[in-house]
Amino acid sequence: MKLSKHGVSFDEAATVFGDPLATTSADPDHSFDEERFLTFGVSRRGRLLAIAHVDRDDTIRIISARIATPAERTIYEEG
C-alpha cells in the first residue's frame, strides 16, 4: 500500500497495532464477506489513526488507514 489518499502510509498504519492503548471493535456495517474491524490508535508519528482491517489466517490485513475524526478521538480517549 502506497501513501493512501488519506496521507497515511502502510508502514505508519501498521505501527498503530503497537499502541498499548489502541481500541479495536467489530465493524458490522462493512462486514459482508468477512468480519471487519476498526482500530483507533496512535502511530509512531504521534498521529491518531483509524485503521479498517480484517484478521485472516492469523494475519492482520489493513484495508484502509486515515486520520481519526473528532468523534473517533473521543472513543479512543475514553478507551
PLM feature spans:
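Ribonuclease/tRNase effector modules and their secretory precursors
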Residues: M1-G79
